[in-house]
Design a protein with these regions (language model features):
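Bacterial N-terminal signal peptides that target proteins for export
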Residues: 1-11
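Cationic-aromatic interfacial patches
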Residues: 21-98
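Conserved, short, structured surface segments that act as functional micro-motifs
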Residues: 205-209, 230-277
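Zn2+-dependent peptidoglycan hydrolase active-site motif and core
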Residues: 188-222, 250
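N-terminal signal peptide c-region/cleavage motif recognized by signal peptidases
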Residues: 14-18
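Short, well-structured beta-strand-loop connectors
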Residues: 85, 184-194, 223-241
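Cleavable N-terminal signal peptides
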Residues: 8-9, 19, 159
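Surface-exposed, glycine-biased beta-strand/turn segments
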Residues: 91-202
């Protein structure tokens, strides 16, 4: 059973996925996870304005209630977090999670320690990436359940603490899915292409805005088959699996950004599809 907020500051119980309507990710209240928070307002009332860490949050009408879908950044510390809902606070708990480590060997040393010219390129690309991830449209981002973007084994999990050639680097901000060079990559849901290009680390990359701060990212493609401004539906081809950028072999790196926080893509897939060694 769910409970509504009482008073100006209230704790809200986060809903188990099975209690919710379809077209929602699974809740996992950890760094890199997702909080699904009932806002205590029926859908017969105006949609609440919700912010978290000074960012606009997705608000969905599910089962006649307004629900916030909140991406929790990977660097969030365990403890109490707060949503600003109109002029009130609603608090929720984030639990601790220890992610495993992964050691990779990269033959191209510049992909581990870029030179000055590389860093200039990386800095410029970061501006483009951040702009794409900050995209916002008012569409319902989950009109239907997501489908896997490529048919393959999940080979590297989200959140891994990574070491390249023995040197620590940023955590793994997506899911790696094995594939053969040239395998098709499809959009998991409806959306608009907001950015494409060849990036230093990510190689050939596509960004899809699904609505309300939900943006997906597809890296290391051998070929890009879409252009910015193009609309896509679930199952439409975005490009082909490749090995461009910083890779050890052909695969798809798939990232999901929610309110500009990288979250576990597996939470948007059926549990049987969310497996990795």
């Amino acid at each position: 059973m769910t409970r509504t907020a009482r008073g100006v500051i209230a704790f809200i119980y986060l809903l188990p996925a099975l209690a919710l309507a379809q077209q929602l990710p699974r809740a996992d209240r950890v760094p890199g996870g997702i909080a699904l928070v009932e806002l205590g307002v029926g859908a017969d009332q105006p949609m609440p304005r919700v912010r978290y860490l000074d960012r606009q949050i997705s608000v969905l009408n599910r089962d006649g209630k307004w629900l916030a879908m909140v991406g929790i950044p990977l660097d969030t510390e365990a403890g109490i977090q707060a949503l600003l809902v109109n002029d009130k606070e609603i608090k929720f708990q984030v639990n601790d999670k220890e992610y495993a480590t992964q050691h990779l060997t990269i033959s191209n040393k510049r992909q581990v320690n870029p030179n000055e010219q590389d860093m200039e390129r990386i800095t410029a690309e970061r501006v483009r990436i951040n702009k794409a991830l900050a995209s916002w449209s008012n569409n319902d981002p989950l009109k239907r359940d997501f489908v896997p973007p490529v048919d393959g084994e999940r080979t590297s999990s989200f959140g891994l603490r990574r070491f390249f050639n023995g040197e620590p680097r940023n955590p793994h901000s997506g899911m790696d899915i094995d594939g053969n060079e040239g395998d098709p990559i499809v959009s998991p849901g409806a959306g608009t292409i907001v950015e494409t290009g060849d990036f230093f680390f990510n190689g050939n990359t596509v960004f899809v805005d699904h609505g309300q701060g939900l943006v997906t990212m597809y890296c290391h493609l051998s070929r890009i088959d879409v252009k910015p401004g193009q609309t896509v539906e679930a199952g439409d081809t975005l490009g082909l699996v490749g090995s461009t950028g910083r890779v050890t072999g052909p695969h798809l790196h798939w990232s999901v950004s929610l309110n500009q926080a990288m979250v576990n893509p597996g939470l948007f897939l059926p549990t049987e599809a969310d497996t990795a060694d």
